[in-house]
């Protein structure tokens, strides 16, 4: 897995170097932007329209979403450790416009 074997990561977009550093350093830079929250099923569509949803897990009680956002996406959201997938989504994903 790249996260464990890479000594340095470069993030480029449109030919421009956005970030460079060790995986640990770069992941720390987005630590406060990765959230999880348990939400009722009816909230999912609204959150998907307004935020980058990295993951969705179903359970009997609620739906757990992993969201990339610079602000808390939901009142009960909590910060979680970022992964390289989260890093990729932070820099390259766009918020869905499912209209």
Label each region the model flagged:
Residues 55, 59-99:
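C-terminal coupling/interaction segments
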Residues 1-67:
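ABC transporter nucleotide-binding domain
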